[in-house]
């Protein structure tokens, strides 16, 4: 639940700061990037401190070297968080984090179905709903970045009202 609270709380705080006059935070995509970055810093750090043992136990047994996998995914989450804060890399970070969320979801399913985690929000349905919110946020950042970079072509032909 903490990642969801971080995502929503920081996104709203940044958007409120934008409404209060901080120009760089006036758009929802920028505020959402900040909320996602905060969330992924928290979850990325959890791969190294606090929840490391639990995260290692969530890795399905078919995958090799769970400790290394948890380390790699933690580093990817931290790198993605930094990437979200830099406008040139934000689309790449959002795309990578989207793929990471999809790729890591089977570990959440495995943990929920095998009783590895005991908190209610880690049960399959709540966890799936949270994962969908996280995915929606990363896809929204990616979509806004792609939309903002699309060239705006002007017609080479003058409009009919200008001809004559």
Label the predicted regions.
Residues 1-164:
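Membrane-interface extramembranous regions
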């Amino acid at each position: 639940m903490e990642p969801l609270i971080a995502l929503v709380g920081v996104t709203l705080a940044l958007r409120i700061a934008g409404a209060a006059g901080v120009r760089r935070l006036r758009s929802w995509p920028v505020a959402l990037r900040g909320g996602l970055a905060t969330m992924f810093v928290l979850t990325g750090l959890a791969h190294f401190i606090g929840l490391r043992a639990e995260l290692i136990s969530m890795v399905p047994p078919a995958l090799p070297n769970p400790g290394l996998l948890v380390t790699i995914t933690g580093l990817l989450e931290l790198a993605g968080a930094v990437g979200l804060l830099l406008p040139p890399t934000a689309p790449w970070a959002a795309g990578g984090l989207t793929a990471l969320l999809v790729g890591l979801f089977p570990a959440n399913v495995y943990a929920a179905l095998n009783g590895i985690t005991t908190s209610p929000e880690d049960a399959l349905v709540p966890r799936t709903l949270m994962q969908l919110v996280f995915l929606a946020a990363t896809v929204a950042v990616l979509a806004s970045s792609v939309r903002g970079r699309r060239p705006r072509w002007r017609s080479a032909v003058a409009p009919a009202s200008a001809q004559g």
